[in-house]
């Protein structure tokens, strides 16, 4: 089912991290989910959301606080990861709307953490790697970070870099620039999944 207006969820996550190796037994976990809703029909960023997520198997390090601005107290006040995924599905229609992120890190982190916790993956199959689309559209040799991409596009960095809600907002601005260039892929219909290996192919 496709929503009227062509809404797109832009997602950016921040996770527990360390300068060097993680402490024994600790794993990187999502502590913030930034979400901006883009109306591809009107070319506007229409909603900005933030979910804080309490880590269960790690703690926010001083290095992580310096990078993201989030403290252990901030993260501990958040919802559990499973509840965060439920909110994404229930309030933001994550399973129905197409979604995008800057690179594939966010998608892979959700996949890993859902598998590790037995949580239902909240998103549908229509994911777009905005970094890859931007790189191709601007003819760049290397895929840029978000801040560099904003400079290439001549756009300001709004808010704080490595804050999920602000990064999602800025990524959404880059996506709207790609829409204006006619470079953003058509997400109005679900993508066909490739057939299983060995399946007969239809000859057209």
Language model feature labels by segment:
Residues 108, 128-131, 169-172:
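Non-catalytic, well-ordered alpha-helical scaffold segments
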Residues 2-3, 152, 172-204:
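Acidic two-metal-ion nuclease catalytic site recognized across multiple nuclease folds
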């Amino acid at each position: 089912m496709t929503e009227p207006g062509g809404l797109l969820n832009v997602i950016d996550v921040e996770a527990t991290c360390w300068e060097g190796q993680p402490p024994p037994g600790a794993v990187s976990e999502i502590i913030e989910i930034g979400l901006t809703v883009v109306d591809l029909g009107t070319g506007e960023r229409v909603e900005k959301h933030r979910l804080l997520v309490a880590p269960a198997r790690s703690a926010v390090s001083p290095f992580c606080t310096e990078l993201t601005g989030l403290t252990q107290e901030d993260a501990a006040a958040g919802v559990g990861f499973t509840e965060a995924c439920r909110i994404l599905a229930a309030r933001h229609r994550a399973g129905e709307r197409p979604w995008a992120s800057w690179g594939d890190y966010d998608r892979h982190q959700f996949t890993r953490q859902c598998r590790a916790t037995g949580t239902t993956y909240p998103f549908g199959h229509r994911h777009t790697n905005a970094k890859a689309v931007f790189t191709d559209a601007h003819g760049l040799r290397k895929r840029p970070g978000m801040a560099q991409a904003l400079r290439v596009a001549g756009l300001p960095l709004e808010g704080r870099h490595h804050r999920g809600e602000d990064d999602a907002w800025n990524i959404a601005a880059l996506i709207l620039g790609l829409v204006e260039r006619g470079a953003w892929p058509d997400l109005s219909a679900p993508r066909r999944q490739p057939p299983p290996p060995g399946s007969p192919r239809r000859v057209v």
